[in-house]
Amino acid sequence: MTISEFESYLEKGLGRAILLLREEPDKTPFREAALRHLCTCGYLEVSYELDLISCFEDAECLAKEAARQNLAAFRAEEGCWNLLLLHALGCQKEIEEIIETRYCQYREKIRTSTENISCYHHNRIGYINTVYTILGDCFPTIEQVKAILPDLAYFFSGATEEDNRNDVIGIYTYLDERFGKEIAEDLLEEGYTYPYGDTWKRLMARYEPRPVDPNITAEELIRLTHSHDRKQLDFCIRSFRAAGTNIVHAVAEAFFAESDIERRHELLLLFLGNKTIPFPYPNRLMDFLTEEDWDAVDPPNVNKRTQYFFSVLSLLAEISHPRVAAIGKRLREGDAFRELGIHMLNANYTPEDLDSLVSYLDPTFLNTPLFNEAVCTICCLSDKGIEGLPLVELISLFENIPAFLRQRLVSSLIKKGLFPNDLREECRYDRNPNIRELIKELS
């Protein structure tokens, strides 16, 4: 294994980087590349990096050097993405000290530098990133969260731009996902008080989703879709999901009656946001497509009609129908939306499409969305029981397949009883933890 091959395998997260390194009698030439990887990776799971460290005889020294360099980068605000690795290397205390110092600095600067817009903007971004670091990477206690809430409320109340307020709303959303949406309410109920408490309550009210209206009429729902407010659109999509068949059909009829492209697209968002609700009139939808729509996919004609047209095609993509198959073929033979054309084969594949599908596995398409879509489609069709697909042949391309698709391929091979033994050990050390789990279950 050459150094460049080793670096390529590490970058792709392939288990062969670990296996082949273990077989090297002299690992010294690979140490610098390994250290470089340990100081530039940014993954949400670090078993792969810990396996890499364990390959070296001086594993403890390598771990200390990786920790030292990552801490230095973190102090310089260049390495926040490696906190999980630093945790695994036992640097919890150092991380908390750096974060506490940084948090206090940014908090003070935000309160004193508002007269300098660029300085304020820089400190605002630093503050927000630090809060996310505390909440996301430091496994915070409830006391740490309590300490942050007053500053967030202050920041929200003093924000003059919508983006500034959206930053705080984003953090509240994160708190919701991490701790449950009742956290701020619970803190208030237990008597925890702070300045700007009313502001924080208003923030929570703004974030809180509008309850679904079970009695909403089709007319009101159609009217409300004409809004650029994200909360309003979310309400419409959730209400549409709970609506009866009559409302679904009424929205579809409103779409056909509408002449404005933007309004048509807004109505289609109700279906796109509810994948379980099929568009009730697919044939009429296909009839609705015009050559003007097709022209909109070709530069320099890309415009609002392009987005609308893509939404229509996305609704048709899962429908098994000769006309949809023809649309998919036209897309694959064109210059735009070819990935969607490949995706349409999931519901409309015939043996005659095999050559077209396989053509996207050509080396000229490696590392492109077209290659990825072709691999995904082959796995999907194989899982449906379709025979004659080059599923096993994909093994030869294994190192060129992204980690999330490697997982799909491994799963499909296992389902078909075609998973090769010589790939088992490599997958056992893949960066993707889900691939490791699949192999563990196979054993």
Spans of features found by a protein language model:
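Charged, amphipathic alpha-helical stretches
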Residues: M1-A73
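Eukaryotic acidic, Ser/Thr-rich intrinsically disordered low-complexity regions
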Residues: T2-L14, Y196, W200-M204, F419-S443
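Extended alpha-helical scaffolding segments
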Residues: I125-P150, Y154-I169, A374-S443
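Short inter-helical turns and helix N-cap capping residues of alpha-solenoid HEAT/ARM repeat scaffolds
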Residues: E161, H228-D229, S259-D260, D293, ...
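Amphipathic alpha-helical scaffolding segments comprising HEAT/armadillo-like alpha-solenoid repeats
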Residues: I3-S4, T28-H37, A59-N70, E94-T114, ...
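Residue-level detector of extended alpha-helical repeat arrays and alpha-solenoid scaffolds
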Residues: R31, I128, R165, R230-D234, ...
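Hydrophobic core/packing positions within alpha-helical solenoid repeats
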Residues: L38, L50-I53, L83-L86, V131, ...
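Hydrophobic core positions within HEAT/HEAT-like alpha-solenoid repeats
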Residues: I18-L21, L35, Y132, L149, ...
